[in-house]
Amino acid sequence: MKSNQFLSVMLLCCVPILGIGQARSFRDFIVAASSPTNPKASETNFKNAGGTDRFLLSEWGKGWALSRGSEIVKEGYAFNFDFERNELYLRKDDEDVMIVADNNSVRRFVIANGTDSARFVKSIAIDKTNKVFFQLMGGSTSGKIALLKLRTSKALPVNKNDYARNVSGDYSTQYRSESVYYFVDSEIGVKGFEKMTRDELLKLFPQHQAIIVKLVTSKKNIDEKTLIAFTNEVNGL
């Protein structure tokens, strides 16, 4: 613990070169200068530690984070998200050190993912501790309906009797991801689900029957893309 505190103090010595707002945000985010991968945080570490089965990206990406004090950390920082630990990681461009953000100090954040971007928010309607980050898939937290996703990643036990592993000599940890979706609605409250059919969606939102019938043409489980389209159309997005 003392070593982490010392590292945090050393990092803070570099803060004056930033603007006052960014310096305060940077200070708020720092809780440790260690990481589950490697403190030197080269871009290959995420690949070696589970890749996109565990992290949002296999290397650092651009983005921004909004602190509890409504200050934005953006310029000069790289970001990634760990689905196993539900943690946001940052790296200051001119310092090869990974920083673990304090979930209590972060309100929301966005990380660029190819041509798209992943938006993460908190929802006290789902998580009373208000510490867990959910991916905002569709709609808006201030709109009629929001579609949130909680993705979790778990390490799988290594099978030393696996022939393929024995031949390759690769005993690295493998991960499995699972997702739970949530509709957060001002009228119905919160509805969590792993899968949903058209009939279930019609029962949940009978007032939006016209939109559902137009978008959902199969009685099978609705795919994520269609769930997002439904949520956005209800919100007029």
Describe these PLM feature segments.
Residues 8, 14, 29-30, 105, ...:
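Detector for intrinsically disordered, low-structure N-terminal pre-sequences
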